[in-house]
From Swiss-Prot:
Main location: cytoplasm
UniProt organism field: Hyphomonas neptunium (strain ATCC 15444)
Any GO BP annotation: ubiquitin-dependent protein catabolic process via the N-end rule pathway
Enzyme Commission designation: 2.3.2.29
One cellular component term from this protein's GO annotations in UniProt: cytoplasm
The protein's name: Aspartate/glutamate leucyltransferase
Catalytic activity: N-terminal L-glutamyl-[protein] + L-leucyl-tRNA(Leu) = N-terminal L-leucyl-L-glutamyl-[protein] + tRNA(Leu) + H(+); N-terminal L-aspartyl-[protein] + L-leucyl-tRNA(Leu) = N-terminal L-leucyl-L-aspartyl-[protein] + tRNA(Leu) + H(+)
Length: 252
C-alpha cells in the first residue's frame, strides 16, 4: 500500500499493517458498475497516527475501519478536501450563513444519545429511505458513533444557546493533524429553507480555519453522480491524484 507521507507513521508500523479487499458489490454512485474497497483495522495503539496518514492517502473511516475504493476498472471516486485558508466564500454562502446565524454549535463527546438518533432516523427516512441506513437501530447508531478508536467529536447544532434547545443538526467529525474530516452529517429534513447540509460544510470550513487547520476532508467526489457532484462547489477543492494532492480544475 502506497502512502502520501509514510514518514508520519510510527517506526515499524507500515510493515505490520494488513490490508484486505472486499468482494465486488453494486456501486452506490454510478449505475451498472461494481465497487470494491480496500480496508484495514484502525483499532491499534497507534490509531491516530495511522488515521492521519491514511486520510492523507485517500482513506475514509467507518467505526474502527479505514477504507478506500479499490475498483479494478474504475477510478471515478476521487478523494477531495477543501483548502480552508483560501476558501472563496460566495454571496450565496453568506446568505446561507445568515439564515442559520441563530444556530449554536456545540462540540460533545462521540457518544450516542436518543435525541441524536431520533433526528438521524427522521433524516434518513426522508432523504435516504432506500439506503443502507434505513433499518438502523439505536444499537447500530451507538456502534457507529462509539466505535471510533481515533479522535472524534459530534458537533451538535441547536436552535438557541440553551442546553435543551431543539437539536437541528449534527455532524460526526474526526480531528486530524491537518484538518477536520466530516464522517457523517444529518439534520432536520423539514427545515429545507435553511440549506442545512450546505451550512454544515460552510461552518466546518470556518471552524477548521479558526483552529488553524488547513483542510476539511469531504470524502469522495464522483463526477456525474447526483449524490456526490455537489462537492465541487467548495473552492478551492483539492483532489488526490495518485499520491499527491492538487487543485481540482474547473473543466474536470
Amino acid at each position: 500500500m502506497k502512502f502520501s507521507d509514510p514518514h508520519l507513521l510510527p517506526a515499524g508500523l507500515e510493515r505490520s499493517l494488513r490490508f484486505y479487499v472486499t468482494n465486488p458489490s453494486p456501486c452506490p454512485y454510478l449505475p451498472d458498475r461494481k465497487e470494491r474497497k480496500a480496508f484495514t483495522n484502525l483499532a491499534i495503539p497507534e490509531a491516530d497516527a495511522l488515521h492521519n496518514v491514511l486520510s492523507q492517502s485517500g482513506f475514509r473511516r467507518s467505526q474502527s475501519i479505514a477504507y478506500r475504493p479499490a475498483c479494478t476498472r474504475c477510478n471515478a471516486c476521487k478523494s477531495v478536501r477543501v483548502a480552508t485558508r483560501e476558501y472563496d466564500i460566495s454571496r450565496n454562502d453568506r446568505r446561507v450563513i445568515a439564515r442559520n446565524a441563530h444556530l449554536v454549535r456545540r462540540p460533545v463527546a462521540a457518544q450516542a444519545t436518543r435525541e441524536q438518533f431520533r433526528l438521524l432516523k427522521s433524516y434518513v427516512v426522508t432523504r435516504h429511505d432506500n439506503g443502507g441506513m434505513s433499518d438502523m437501530t439505536y444499537r447500530d447508531y451507538v456502534a457507529m458513533v462509539g466505535g471510533s478508536p481515533v479522535q472524534s467529536l459530534i458537533f451538535e447544532y441547536r436552535d438557541g444557546p440553551e442546553p435543551d434547545a431543539p437539536l437541528v443538526a449534527a455532524a460526526i467529525t474526526d480531528v486530524l493533524r491537518d484538518g477536520l474530516s466530516m464522517v457523517y452529517t444529518f439534520f432536520d429534513p423539514a427545515k429545507t429553507s435553511q440549506s442545512l447540509g450546505h451550512y454544515l460544510i460552510l461552518d466546518h470550513i470556518r471552524h477548521a480555519h479558526d483552529l488553524g487547520l488547513p483542510h476539511l476532508y469531504l470524502g469522495y467526489w464522483v463526477k456525474g453522480s447526483p449524490k456526490m457532484d455537489y462537492k465541487r462547489r467548495y473552492k478551492p477543492l483539492e483532489v488526490l491524484d495518485g499520491d499527491r494532492w492538487r487543485p481540482l480544475r474547473d473543466d474536470e
